Structures are given as structure tokens and as C-alpha cells.
Amino acid sequence: METKNYSSSTSGFILLGLSSNPKLQKPLFAIFLIMYLLTAVGNVLIILAIYSDPRLHTPMYFFLSNLSFMDICFTTVIVPKMLVNFLSETKIISYVGCLIQMYFFMAFGNTDSYLLASMAIDRLVAICNPLHYDVVMKPWHCLLMLLGSCSISHLHSLFRVLLMSRLSFCASHIIKHFFCDTQPVLKLSCSDTSSSQMVVMTETLAVIVTPFLCTIFSYLQIIVTVLRIPSAAGKWKAFSTCGSHLTVVVLFYGSVIYVYFRPLSMYSVMKGRVATVMYTVVTPMLNPFIYSLRNKDMKRGLKKLRHRIYS
């Protein structure tokens, strides 16, 4: 069989999408368009509410506004191309376009992960060490955490894309997914991917597990501290400040772990698609609702923003 390297000798890949059934393309287009618009509008409202209300200019809401921005970027990398493909017969993505999509998908997704860890640290300091909160979570420290999150994520993405660009591909160029993700693309390669899989798994463990463990450790510390609070009202107040964030963490990491922390031989296309939709589309769409429905400060900020818009 002749081996061809797609980086130089082909026009690109074909994205199979969520379903090959022609009758489902328009309904899926409508569903994902609505979800994308809800994601964009909801997260923009969160950002505007935070920046328009001085009382929300705190470390927690600084990270939340950046998380909302990253969620918009994250879904924009994937959903617009998916929407075009729903109404297109070719569903082609160029080789370079595939690598670019893969790069920004990983960069924004990993930044999301680090921002969730930063928010967990913020809650840890606020609940477990409130007297030192202003010192530990000063604006300069928060900015450094944000810059560190972005830098590590983009370096990780660059390394991964450079690794993928060295692979060769054979006759098949159909990606059984709705975007260019690592596992489906690796499955197409006719190169020896064992070393690539090992590097990807090791590097993924280092980059993704680090913020995840940081988040878990923070919440274990928070739980221990809250359980020592004598009054039930005090416990409820402490837990209520973390409930929204913890819900988002479970949704995000639950699906990420299911998709990425398995050998390539165990990868299931259909299950992988469903789990990927959860953290790439559903979670970013739900985040504004999760963070605002039970948050009095956010409700006040959104109400204030609404009065400004209509006044």
C-alpha cells in the first residue's frame, strides 16, 4: 500500500460528523445552532455583568469572566465548522485547517481546565484561610495565574500539533468525528503510532491531570474545613459558594477523562462523540446558567446590566 503524507500530497480530510443520516442533518443543524447561540449570548452576558458591576471585581469573578470568554472561543473552534458540514455534502477540512483546529481546541480546552483549578484555589483560600485572602489572591497574582494557564496550554497544543504533523496517512482520510481531535486522527495514521500514543498519554497526564488534582485537593481541603464549622447554616453558606463551580468541574472533567484517558484500542467512536459533545458544547452552554441561577451576586449584576441596557 502506498503511504502518503497528507501534509503535502492531499487536499485534506473528510469529517464524518455526528451522523451520516441525511434526514438528521437539518435537525442537528438547528439544535447545535441554538446551543451555540445560547453559549455565546449567555457567556457574553456573564462577562458584561461582571465588568459593569464594581462589586463583582473580585478574583472569583475575574476567573469566571475569563472562563466565559474561553468557553466562547472553545465552542467557536468547533461548532461553526460543524454547522457548515451539516448543510454540506463534502464535509472536507484541509490538512492545515485540521491542525489549526486541533491546536486551538486543545489550547482553549486546557486553559478552561487551568481556570477551573484557579477558581478552586480561590475558594480554598476564601474558606480555609480568609484572613490572608486579600494577600494571596491580589490582582497581580490572579493575572499571573491567568497568564500561566494560557502559556502552558498553548505550549502543550503546539507540542501536540508538531507531533501530529510528523505522522503519515494512508488511503483512508475519513475522520470518524465532527472535528479534528487527537484520537480519531491517530487512528487514520499508517505510521507506527505507539510512541506517539505514549507521548500523548504521558503529556496529557502531566498537563490535564495537574489542574484536576489541584481542583480535587482544594475541594478535599474545603470539605474538611466546612465539616468543622459548628452551625448548619455556616456549613450551608460555605458549600453554597462552591456548589456551582463543583457542578461545572464534574461535567467538564467527567467527559474529558472518559474520552482521553483510555488506550487508543479502547476508543469507541460513538461513545467518544457523545462524551465530546458534553464538554465541548453542552458544558459551555450550561455554565452561564449554573453560575447565575443560584448566585445572588451574579443575579444582581445581570439585573443591573439589564437596567443599563433598557434605560
Curated annotation (Swiss-Prot):
Residues 1-26, 81-101, 160-197, 261-273 are extracellular. The chain crosses the membrane at residues 27-50, 59-80, 102-121, 141-159, 198-220, 238-260, 274-293. Keywords: Cell membrane, Disulfide bond, G-protein coupled receptor, Glycoprotein, Membrane, Olfaction, Receptor, Sensory transduction, Transducer, Transmembrane, Transmembrane helix. Glycans are attached at residue 5. GO terms for cellular component: plasma membrane. It is found in: Cell membrane. InterPro entries: GPCR_Rhodpsn, GPCR_Rhodpsn_7TM, Olfact_rcpt. One of its GO terms (biological process) is signal transduction. Belongs to the G-protein coupled receptor 1 family. This is Olfactory receptor 1L4. It comes from Homo sapiens (Human). The gene is OR1L4.
